[in-house]
Amino acid sequence: MPTETERCIESLIAVFQKYSGKDGNSCHLSKTEFLSFMNTELAAFTKNQKDPGVLDRMMKKLDLNSDGQLDFQEFLNLIGGLAIACHESFLQTSQKRI
C-alpha cells in the first residue's frame, strides 16, 4: 500500500499526464495545455489574478530551456513554488494566532 507521499507523487504524475499530449507531445505541456491546467486545476489562483498577462509570464519564467513548452521538471518547479508560497502563508497565519 503506497504511503501518503507516494500517493501525492503518483497524483502529480497523473495530473501532468492528463494535460500533456493533447497537442502531440505527451512529455511536455504546450502553452495551450498549461493554460488549460491552470484554469482547471488552479482555477481559484487564476481567477484572482487581476493582470491578464500573468499566466504568459509564468509560462516564460518556468520554461527554463525556452522551447515554448514545459517538461515535467519545469512543471514541478511550478508546483514546488506554489507549495512554498502556501507553506509560508500557513506559517504566517499560525504565528498570528500565538
From Swiss-Prot:
Residues that the record marks as modified (N6-acetyllysine) are K22
Annotated ranges, domain EF-hand: 12-47, 50-85
Where are its TM segments located?
none
Q: Alphabetically, which GO biological process terms does the record hold?
A: positive regulation of smooth muscle cell migration; regulation of cell population proliferation
Is Ribonucleoprotein one of the keywords?
no
Q: Which UniProt keyword terms apply here?
A: Acetylation, Calcium, Cytoplasm, Disulfide bond, Metal-binding, Nucleus, Phosphoprotein, Repeat
Q: Which Pfam families match?
A: EF-hand_1, S_100
GO MF annotation list: calcium ion binding; calcium-dependent protein binding; protein homodimerization activity; S100 protein binding
Q: Which residues, renumbered to this chain, carry the PTM Phosphothreonine?
A: T5
One Gene Ontology cellular component term attached to this UniProt record is:
nucleus
The residues that hold Ca(2+) 2 are D63, N65, D67, Q69, E74
What biological function has been recorded for the protein in this entry? Facilitates the differentiation and the cornification of keratinocytes.
Q: How does it assemble?
A: Homodimer; disulfide-linked.
Q: What is this protein called?
A: Protein S100-A11
Natural source organism: Rattus norvegicus
Q: Which gene encodes it?
A: S100a11
